[in-house]
């Protein structure tokens, strides 16, 4: 239990930040799941690209707010981009 007023305030502030960061991380996880679901459902490439852009946007927002380190975000976006590229190549090969 904090004894000083500043420590008590920091407990409150940290609680608010934790809640906000949890919401942001959840938003990223949900958008990534939606992107993966779009790939697994063999949806049109336009839908997959839209889901990718939404996930990428949410990840960048987390970087701007200090929730993710920029290298973590780059790694996540790179992995998603690789999945999108592989999906596109697989669709092109199946069409031929």
Curated annotation (Swiss-Prot):
A Pfam family of this chain: Ribosomal_S20p
GO BP terms in the entry = translation
Q: List the disulfide bonds.
A: none
Gene Ontology MF term list: small ribosomal subunit rRNA binding; structural constituent of ribosome
- Sorted alphabetically, which keywords does the UniProt record give? Ribonucleoprotein, Ribosomal protein, RNA-binding, rRNA-binding
- Read off the InterPro entries from this record: Ribosomal_bS20, Ribosomal_bS20_sf
Q: Which residues form a coiled coil?
A: none
Q: Which GO terms describe its cellular component?
A: small ribosomal subunit
Described by its record, this protein's role is as follows: Binds directly to 16S ribosomal RNA.
For this chain, the family text in UniProt reads:
Belongs to the bacterial ribosomal protein bS20 family.
Under which name does UniProt file this protein? Small ribosomal subunit protein bS20
This protein's species is Anaplasma phagocytophilum (strain HZ)
